[in-house]
Amino acid sequence: MNNKTLLLTGASGYLGQHLAVRAAEKFELYSAFGANPSGITAGQPVQLDLGARAAVHQTVDRLRPQAIIHAAAINPGSGDAVAMQRINADGSRYLAEAAVAVGARLVFVSTDVVHSGLTPPYTDNAPPTPINDYGRSKAAGEAAVAEIDPTAAIVRTSLIYGLEKMDRGTDSFVKRLESGQTLILFNDVIRNPVWVESLAEALLKLAELDFAGILNVVGRQALSREAFGRRLLAYWGIDTNNKVQAGHAADISATIPLDLRLTCTKAEQLLQMTLYGVDDVLAMNGSKNLNT
């Protein structure tokens, strides 16, 4: 029987689904969701409105978890600036308050988008320079967590992908291709994609460590969105029918950070693990053809 208790927010999301399965092996797990519990893969489902301060405090006080991994967020495309502020900034503040009140270890999942993309590569302690609503809301969440709970771990990560279940980004690419649209992938947007299994392992390790502060947890290989997208489409065996073209984000919007390369040597040393790049992960896992 697991004696340690863990509250996982965002448990019905892509990262949360992978985290929950792993976490349930080590913890008595409470899997928090906002509105729809259908994506919960493990743990005891708990409905939680992160934007309601009283509800957050009451839920955490009732469950009294020893650790909290805060993976819930409103991402671009799933909510506007108001929703992002409510959940990503205010909700993170409320959760940090509640964690301190019950003495819970807090691990907050943040993003590389807190940076502008103008001065890469970004070290773990590089100050935020957000240029869009999502980045500003997550930077505000970071600041609140650091102020309220200086012992918390703040994890900046990047594009998350998996090879058992198609990630949200690749799935959207496939839907566009299937509808006959031409898919434009940016070759001037650079990221360090992270394998969901690596990220989940890192977060669970941090839940049991006393590291405090900001830690970059990303794959060690930097790729353009075009190169990354083409690799994953090939892995899943998707016939692109020459419908994939390179594009330039800089020509479209001034609020898309271009080069968000992050360093990850500190995380690899602290967590004693290799944060594999995309090519290494694909080589270890072969390919999956959905057309057969």
Segments predicted by a language model, with ranges:
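N-terminal Rossmann NAD(P)H-binding glycine-rich loop of SDR-like oxidoreductase domains
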Residues: 3-26
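NAD(P)H-binding glycine-rich loop region in Rossmannoid oxidoreductase-like domains
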Residues: 47-88
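Short alpha-helix in the Rossmann-fold core of NAD(P)-dependent oxidoreductases
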Residues: 87-92, 137-138
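Conserved Rossmann-fold NAD(P)-dependent oxidoreductase catalytic core, especially the SDR/UDP-sugar
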Residues: 93-131
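NAD(P)-dependent short-chain dehydrogenase/reductase
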Residues: 143-191, 198
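Glycine-rich Rossmann NAD(P)(H)-binding loop
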Residues: 185-190, 215-223, 270
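Mid/C-terminal beta-alpha module of Rossmann-like enzyme folds, strongest
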Residues: 202-205, 209-258
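Conserved C-terminal active-site "lid" loop/helix of NAD(P)H-dependent oxidoreductases
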Residues: 224-230, 246-292
